[in-house]
Structure formats: C-alpha cells, structure tokens
Regions:
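Surface-exposed helix-capping loop/turn segments at secondary-structure junctions
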Residues: 211, 258-269, 292, 317-323
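N-terminal chloroplast transit peptides
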Residues: 1-29, 36-39
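GST superfamily/GST-like fold recognition
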Residues: 266-292, 299, 313
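Amphipathic alpha-helical interaction segments
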Residues: 200, 271, 275-276, 280, ...
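Acidic, serine/threonine/proline-rich low-complexity intrinsically disordered regions
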Residues: 240-243, 290-304
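A contiguous, mid-protein "functional segment" used to position or interact
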Residues: 305-337
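GST-like domain detector, emphasizing the conserved glutathione-binding G-site
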Residues: 29-266, 303, 336-390
Length: 390
C-alpha cells in the first residue's frame, strides 16, 4: 500500500503547562541581581566590582593610590603643619597678634579649643587663678573642613558665629587674613583681637588676676623667677623637635625626669607658667603623641617622676576640668585625618584615665621644709590642692 494510503497517526494530546509561580518580591535582591553596581552603597566598591569583579585591584591601582595619597598628604601637611624646607621639621606659624598692646577694656572673652595644647595653657591659667567669672569662655571644635567651628552644643557665646574665622574677621581694624587660631583673647567692647599667643595670654592673665585679687595668693609669674620660667618654657616647647629627631625629644624627657626627681616643680617649690607649659604637653603624651606621632620609645608612665608630676598638677583645684581626654583624642585622631585617614579612635590608655591621674603622687616630700613651715607663703591654692589630694 502506498505510504500516503496509510491512515495518519492519531493526534497526540496537547500538553498544557502551567506558568511557573512568580518569584517572591525582593526589591533589594532583584536590584542586586539585575544591577550589582547600582545596588552597592559604596561608589568605590561598586567601581571596583565593575572593573575587577570581587578580586583585588591590580598592582597598578595600588601604586597609583599610594603615590596619589603621598602627594595629597604632602600638600595637606604643608598647609596644616608648615615645615622647614631643608629639614622637614615642624615650624609653628608665628602668631599674627603675638603680644598684648595697650590696655584692653574690661570686657574680655577667651576662645579656646580643647584638643590644642597651646589653648590649654590659657584655659589652665584661667582655672588656676580663679578667673572663670571674670573671663567668659567659648569653646571651638575642629570642623570637617579643618577650621575651628562652633556647634549647638558648643556655641560662640558672644556673637553666635559658626566659625572662629568669622570672629577674627569681625575685628573693627581692617578685618583679618591668615590662620584663625586658638587661643584667642578678644576685646568684646572694642571688637578687636587682644592677643593670640598662648604664653603672652597666660602672662596677661597672671597680671589680671593679681590686679583683681582672684588668684588666692598663687603667683604663676613671680618677678624673681621670670628668667627661669622663660628658660623652662622654651625648653618645654622643644617637644616639637620630635618631627626632626625623636632622640631630641627623649633626651629632653630624660633631662626633665632627672630634674623633677629632686624638685617638686620646674622652678622649685613654686608652681609657675613653666609648669603650665610642660603639663599641657605631658598630659597628651601617652594619649596622642606616643602613637599618632610615633614617639614610641617610651611612654610617659614609664618616667616615674614625670608621671607623678603630671598627677600632682592634675589634682589641683580646677585642673581636671580643663583636661577633656575624649575631646583631645577626637581632635587629634579624628580631625588630623592626614595622620589618621581611617579616623579610628584608639582606646584611652589606662595611664590617662581619671582614676590613674587621681592616684597619690607622693611629691609633697619634695617641697622644702621652709615652704611647709611658712604655711603656703604665697602659694595658698597650691597647698590647698596638696591637702585635698591626700
């Protein structure tokens, strides 16, 4: 029979398939599957995945970032921390208003920043001499742009400005160009800068307290010790030399350790401005300088006399209130991002805790018997602090 004469095969039954059930709606997962780049929260991570997947970037990128960061770091440091072109050592920018000129009005205002050791000098003298009511205070904080700024929690109590630069710029005499630094002693009546050099502000406050009689007998700037004070103040500032040679820093600390092992304060039994200048450096050493500035040969706590000396001053009335360790750490590790680009804040060392700084210092024995028999002899607040700490 011919092929075409055979009956056709019966038609197969039609198989109807049901559509697959819809996938559960996961907007994030769907966006990630369709567009992993768009789903990424981090633009740098997204770009990295687009170019290289999940693998590490190639060595060329590492080299480019390394050299680019080094160049950017150098530029930032030249602006934020000027240095000697020949040696690379830190060179502090001279103050625009280095001395008190004339006689300021009675309406004075002090601007400080808690992380700054130079501003801390003025703040410490204000506390030691009992000038809190006489001298109102505004505390600036490091802003994201590196400028001293004010916040709702730490406002400009005088004018309500947002930046310290705006206070400088509001001066009546020709405005201001340059760095808006702290400390700043401001004449609120005449709207002009009195001084922004820390040691000169400290000396002025000593004279102000003596005239007001608010110092309680404490004289941080006695005429008979001024030559020694100036010598020690200059020596205390040599901590900046670690940028050039760390050996100079630790040689200076060794010399101070030796001197203070036989003398309660730098100039004998009397607390002076020289001690103020040194204290604001020492109280930051283990907290900041040891790790951030790579001063790692020894910690301050390893110097028995220096650490006891620091505790001695810390325990004087009003001093602890000027030492905000959290603000100091944040000001260095958070604001100085060229030195700590990750912005990670380390734990406060045990030696810098209030509990450690309030431990007995035992330095009363270094005071001469003549000073003890005199009942304080011109240093009443100092002996009051000693008795309070025991």
């Amino acid at each position: 029979m011919p092929m075409w004469s055979q009956p056709p095969p019966p038609p197969s039954s039609l198989q109807l398939r049901r559509p697959p059930p819809p996938l559960p709606h996961h907007p994030r997962r769907l966006r990630s599957r369709l567009s992993p780049i768009a789903a990424s929260q981090d633009p740098l991570t997204a770009l990295s995945r687009l170019l290289w997947g999940r693998a590490l970037p190639p060595s060329q990128l590492v080299l480019a970032v390394r050299h680019g960061w080094t160049a950017a770091w150098g530029l930032l440091m030249r602006q934020l921390a000027p240095s000697d072109p020949a040696t690379g050592a830190f060179t502090r920018t001279p103050s625009r208003f280095p001395a008190v000129v004339g006689t300021p009005s009675a309406r004075l205002h002090l601007y400080v920043g808690l992380p700054c050791p130079w501003a801390h000098r003025a703040l410490l003298v204000r506390a030691l001499l009992g000038l809190e009511r006489r001298l109102p205070l505004s505390v600036a904080v490091p802003g994201d742009d590196g400028a001293w700024s004010f916040t709702p929690d730490s406002p400009d109590a005088l004018y309500g400005k947002r930046k310290l630069r705006e206070v400088y710029a509001s001066a009546r005499r020709g405005g201001f160009e340059g760095r808006a630094s702290v400390p700043l002693l401001w004449d609120a009546e005449r709207r002009e800068v009195v001084c922004n050099e820390s040691i000169e502000i400290a000396k002025f406050l000593c004279d102000l307290a003596a005239a007001d009689g608010s110092a309680g007998g404490l004289d941080l700037w006695p005429p008979e010790l001024r030559q020694d004070i100036d010598r020690w103040c200059g020596f205390a500032q040599s901590q900046e030399a670690y940028d050039d040679a760390a050996g100079e820093l630790f040689a200076a600390l060794d010399r101070l350790e030796d001197h203070l092992s036989g003398s309660r304060y730098l100039c004998g039994d009397t607390l002076t401005l020289a001690d103020v200048c040194l204290f604001t450096t020492l109280v930051r050493f283990d907290l900041v300088y040891h790790s951030l500035f790579r001063c790692t040969r020894r910690k301050l706590v390893e110097y028995a006399s220096l650490h006891a000396y620091t505790r001695d001053i810390y325990q004087m009335p009003g001093v602890a209130g000027t030492c905000d360790m959290a603000a100091i750490a944040d000001g260095y590790f958070g604001a100085l991002f060229p030195l700590n680009p990750g912005g990670i804040l380390p734990l406060v060392p045990a030696s810098c805790s209030p509990e450690a700084l309030l431990e007995p210092h035992g330095r009363e024995a270094l005071s001469s018997s003549a000073a003890a028999d005199a009942g304080g002899g011109g240093n009443g607040r100092q002996l009051e602090a000693t008795s309070a700490s025991n």
